[in-house]
Amino acid sequence: MDFKAGQHQVQHLPAETLQFLLGSRYCETDVLSEEAWRLFKDTPLGWPRVQAICDFVHNHLAFGYEHARPTRTAAEAYAERRGVCRDFAHLAITFCRCLNIPARYCTGYVSDIGIPPPHAPMDFAAWMEVYLGGRWFTFDPRNNGIPFGRILIAQGRDAADVPLT
């Protein structure tokens, strides 16, 4: 963890990160941009801003497997205030992108070590990676703790890039 990892100016980002600044099927940056700036405009850039986004999403959404809906977008999750891990990830990714922070969707297995219920052992989960300080860092707005014990299966712009069958 590099809690001092800084945010890059857009013109200094590597070309391969730029696609992770754009809106996508489940991450509607055009819908949530004003809200992102309203909520986080005064938050310090870089790691503190991303952590503030994760803290907000973690507290704003109610988690529950009964809330699972495969078509829910970030804007819908924000309005409905509920979802599953993919909704937490989509909302945090969207806020990051609105604030010019490259963020990508990750899916895989998360260890149950040190993570409070409700979750199944070695639960299939979604989280995000954010580009700060010249590298990608893992953030999990659903569990909102130091991420460890993850098995990455796929990465993409959002869940549409890495569908489960």
Language-model features: locations:
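Hydrophobic/aromatic-rich core segments of domains that either
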Residues: 55, 87-165
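Secondary-structure boundary elements
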Residues: 3-6, 11-83, 91, 159
